[in-house]
Amino acid sequence: MKVQPRFIVLVSLLLTAYSALNFYIGWHVAEWSAAVVIGYSPYGFWIPFALLAYGFLLGRIPLPNALKPAGRLLKVAGSVYIFVMEIGLLLFLLADAVRLVLWLTNGVSEAYIVGSGTVVLGLIALLLLVGSRNAWSPVVRSHELSIDKPADGGKTEWTVAVASDIHLGNLVGRKHLRRLVERINAMKPDLILLPGDVIDDSIEPFLRNQMSRTLGRLQAKHGVYAVLGNHEYYGGHIPEYIEEMRKVG
């Protein structure tokens, strides 16, 4: 397949912008580390930081079986870092706004560098913990809908369970899925809908951890129905995914 020059230019621009953002974040963390860490080494910081920042991309490179666990680790760490990068960028920009005001007035002291860096990194850690707890704790929200149409069998009320954007993969695994299945089955739904993005992108962890078997434990009187989402298409294994879902009904 011939790669279009426009595509190469676009990817180059995106990588350049991504690298610039990560250098900005890394520079701040390195500055803070140099002030508080005894024996700080630029190489000891920047090499692990680069692996973390590009982990999501590096983890997608095909590897021999012996190295696949390392690739999965990079991808998981890189996925978490994407969240850290987004929050860190906003917080460091805010800290730099204050820093600019100080620089224009009395100058920036090392105490501010240490203090602001500690606050930013502490907030990132706190938000990461809260976000992880929310992501791995299924929340049930109830909505009542009225439809002016009789249901089959004369039943006037149906309980429909809808779970979208589950993103099963290396980060969201079988343990989370079991909790989700238990919560849904406890509702005793008449119908279960999975409207897309059941898997994150790669089908490999879905197959390796036999997550379809856990999904097969979903119970509803009128069945379980799933459709494809954009992340299923990202992985490029649509036939295998459909076949695996059909095996469990």
Report the location of each language-model feature.
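Soluble catalytic domains of enzymes that build or remodel membrane lipids, polysaccharides, and related
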Residues: 146-249
